[in-house]
């Protein structure tokens, strides 16, 4: 089964590692572009890019995943399934419709609580004693607000 993985922060790396260890054919890893960090503003890769490169996986870093060029590059990866974990951009319908078996999203909260960005931080700031992870299958996603 051909898997395209889309993720960016440390939270995403565990899922990517599990897919590699399970022996799935990962035809592409899509992550955010490198960004300047630290006092010297050196360009730094995302944690997902570092993990993908460690395993010799092909990495694609579009500035905007909804651009025609990005959609075509992901289409070339021929996904049977797309796994999304904290990617950080709205994924267009053209991409969500590509895989034969659909898309799976892993979100770091018990949805609908803390939908959108920074769900772990919001749970901590609000003093929640219970939190969790939600896994959902979808065919068209808009980034919740």
In which residue ranges do the predicted regions lie?
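One-carbon transfer enzymes
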Residues: 1-141
